[in-house]
Amino acid sequence: MSIRIIPQDELEKSEKRTADMIPPLLFPRLKNLYNRRAERLRELAENNPLGDYLRFAALIAHAQEVVLYDHPLEMDLTARIKEANAQGKPPLDIHVLPRDKHWQKLLHSLIAELKPEMSGPALAVIENLEKASEQELEQMASALFESNFASVSSDKAPFIWAALSLYWAQMASLIPGKARAEYGEQRQYCPVCGSMPVSSMVQIGTTQGLRYLHCNLCETEWHVVRVKCSNCEQSRDLHYWSLDNEQASIKAESCGDCGTYLKILYQEKDPKVEAVADDLASLVLDARMEQEGFARSSINPFLFPGEGE
């Protein structure tokens, strides 16, 4: 199954869904999203061997919250949604959509917000980014979108991505339409922007028991059934790994067919789990999966592969 976004003016003629149909997409709800992420990162930093880095990530998430409200985005995406729907493409496709200079404005605002909190190497990194030309910043953004991670140092990537993510999340929250599930493939990528997931979550509330993958760029969540590989869609050789026990709130779902894994967070086990924060705080599980010979099918926005990885 694939997911397509239907323009607002086409909803009535396609609206044959029943009231209890599974929502294929959950667009980002930006109110307090970054504050909640920052709080969770700080909470997880306690007694965690990666505590310092989690607190560093919390600073970036908090800065995103501040910049979000200082620089709201106004954009009419109606024409873009119609065009993308006709082409069967994600409306905010990272490989097609021209980038507005708004994202660089967000980056410089993030830097200004973070500078008083940074010191040492981290301060040097953002000062270097502050001096970079528009062309250099665009080249780094393009490299990240093309998964050419060797071209962007791993210490610069989180700052660049934080600005890009804020921009894409703002756009995603403005999409005037709804989603419809259709037959097709490639549900391993975000139906809104085409980026990768960071993790998946089995939710509570109105979507109780359903699994949604969380986009590492635009913050959209999309439904993928449980007990099925989110990367290759096979289900015959899946295994579940945890560091604690059967009731762990974080597990890794591995697939013997494609050799990858994706973490699953369970809100019913811990209602406070957060897609980005809990993924970053559980890198010990990633190390275990690497030892078992599996590769991540996701990328955390605060931890990009370095050269040679």
Swiss-Prot record:
Instruction: Tell me the GO BP annotations in alphabetical order.
Output: protein maturation
Q: Subcellular location, in the record's words?
A: Cytoplasm
Keyword 4Fe-4S found? no
Q: Name one GO molecular function term.
A: ferric iron binding
Species annotation: Citrobacter koseri (strain ATCC BAA-895 / CDC 4225-83 / SGSC4696)
What this chain does, per the record? Necessary for formate dehydrogenase activity.
Gene3D superfamilies, alphabetically?
FdhE-like domain
Any GO CC annotation of this UniProt entry:
cytosol
Q: Which CDD domains match?
A: FdhE
- What's this protein's name? Protein FdhE homolog
This protein's encoding gene:
fdhE
